A protein has these predicted regions:
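Short, flexible, solvent-exposed loop/turn segments with mixed acidic/basic and small polar residues
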Residues: 79-80, 188-195, 304-308, 402-406
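Short, low-order "capping/linker" segments at domain edges
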Residues: 141-145, 242-255, 357-368
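His/Glu-rich zincin catalytic helix
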Residues: 1-69, 101, 175-178, 188-292, ...
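Short amphipathic beta-strand starts and helix->beta connectors
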Residues: 70-75, 179-190, 242, 296-303, ...
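M16 family metallopeptidases and their MPP-like homologs
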Residues: 14-16, 22-42, 59-115, 151-174, ...
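Glycine-rich, mobile lid/loop segments that gate access to catalytic sites or pores
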Residues: 139, 143-147, 158, 162
């Protein structure tokens, strides 16, 4: 069970007591409305903060300090959750009860997080220019590596054309041009502003009591002058009109991406039915798209669907030969129409239900998966706790899935055609 504590206005701790693990975790996230003008800066910030503090001014010093904390680790945390982008740090550390000779780990870990957040290496009124330039190169490399994965690239292009006036079309890490414009002083000014204004979400998993950790976290944040600006609520997909676009590229396998929209989100009652519909339609090896379009008809090399529950968007991605484009388009639509017409078997529903339930069962397998699921779910606006979600999935019937399918409409598509095909 998750306990929720408001430490200060706009500062929330979500507390998950669990003594099963030797490791605990603590995440710190600044939650921002997703915006093109700051996405790249938010993506860059955690990496710069991790480069050094006033007491531990370089990576070697940080590594030695974490080794002293029984091999603790701190990593960058950048997420996109619907209309939000989060930027922050994730800490993993041994529980105090496993330390030798009564050593403490939790309190020094929280203090080190404080130093990373509030005592960075400074230079001429900004972050270290060397640190910023180095991490800009790393971020650009990450952005380009995603672009070099043509499946990921095509999916991102689809979301851009579907969401020209919706924050969901903004890349999670920003773009190369935005990264290149960032300088150390501007990044520090931005950081100071979002520390003051942003909603702060912290998530703890471990065996410490709330009475133990809350004073540590309050003390960590006491030095921040806050002027919290309320965060807008998540919104469903903003439809600015559909598009069907194409692009050519020197690749051997073409990529077809199709986007469908629905009013069903994770904030509506029939969310579980839409999750099962997505699984039956295209998510997994028992889905209609995989079993029919790929296996029986051999029309594609790969195919699958994904449901963005915060926005009410389902996307289908397929790796195909260019000459099969129209055939594959038509067959994807036909497989959805089969669902809409009620041609779903009990076997398909059972397989889909078990796939979703299996995923839910793994949520509590590790501190990291607990934090990842629940921290994201709370930001996304999901109205069901884990057990309510599980029961909702169990109770879904074929008629519910068919009703969910009937709400889906094709909105946009993007075709990335190989020039050599």
């Amino acid at each position: 069970m998750i306990q929720v504590f408001e430490l200060f206005p706009g500062v929330t701790l979500r507390f998950f007591a669990d003594s099963r693990f030797k490791q605990g975790c603590l995440s710190f996230q600044l939650v921002r409305p997703m915006a093109a003008e700051e996405a790249a800066m938010n993506a860059l910030l955690p990496a710069v903060l991790l480069r050094g503090t006033q007491a531990y001014p370089d990576l070697r010093a940080i590594t030695l300090h974490l080794d002293d904390l029984y091999g603790a680790s701190v990593s960058a945390l950048v997420r996109r959750v619907g209309d939000y982008q989060t930027t922050g740090l994730y800490c993993s550390f041994m529980e105090d009860r496993y330390a030798m000779d009564g050593d403490e780990i939790l309190a020094p870990m929280v203090d080190f997080l404080r130093q990373l957040l509030l005592e960075p290496v400074m230079e001429d009124g900004g972050f270290s220019a060397d640190f910023v330039e180095s991490e800009k190169k790393n971020l650009i490399s990450t952005i380009e590596s995603e672009l070099n994965d043509k499946r990921v690239y095509a999916g991102a292009q689809l979301l851009k054309i579907m969401c020209p006036e919706d924050a969901f079309g903004i890349p999670r890490l920003g773009d190369r041009a935005s990264v290149e414009k960032i300088d150390a002083k501007a990044l520090y000014r931005h950081y100071q502003r979002i520390l003051r204004e942003s909603r702060v979400e912290m998530f703890y998993v471990g065996s410490a009591s709330p009475e133990r950790i809350i004073p540590l976290l309050k003390n960590m944040l006491a030095g921040i002058e806050r002027c919290y600006v309320n965060l807008p609520e998540q919104t469903a997909f903003h439809d600015a009109g559909g598009q069907h676009t194409r692009e050519t590229m020197d690749i051997t396998q073409s990529k077809l991406c199709m986007g469908f929209v629905t009013p069903i989100t994770n904030r509506t009652e029939n969310f579980a039915a839409m999750q099962l519909l997505n699984t039956i339609f295209g998510a997994g090896m028992t889905s209609k798209l995989f079993m029919n379009v790929r296996e029986k008809m051999s029309l594609c090399y790969s195919i699958g669907s994904g449901y963005y529950g915060t926005k009410g968007i389902i996307t289908v991605s397929a790796g195909i030969d260019a000459h099969q484009e129209e055939t594959v388009r038509s067959e994807i639509v036909r497989q959805l129409q089969l669902c809409q017409n009620g041609q779903i078997t009990e076997e398909e529903l059972t397989a889909a239900r078990e796939a979703v339930l299996s995923g839910l069962r793994t949520v509590h397998d590790s501190p990291g998966s607990i934090e990842g699921y629940h921290a994201t779910a709370s930001l996304s606006g999901l109205r069901l706790d884990l057990e309510e979600y599980r029961q909702a999935v169990i109770s879904v019937q074929i008629a519910d899935v068919v009703a969910a399918a009937k709400t889906l409409k094709l909105h946009s598509s993007f075709f990335l055609q190989g020039v050599g095909e």
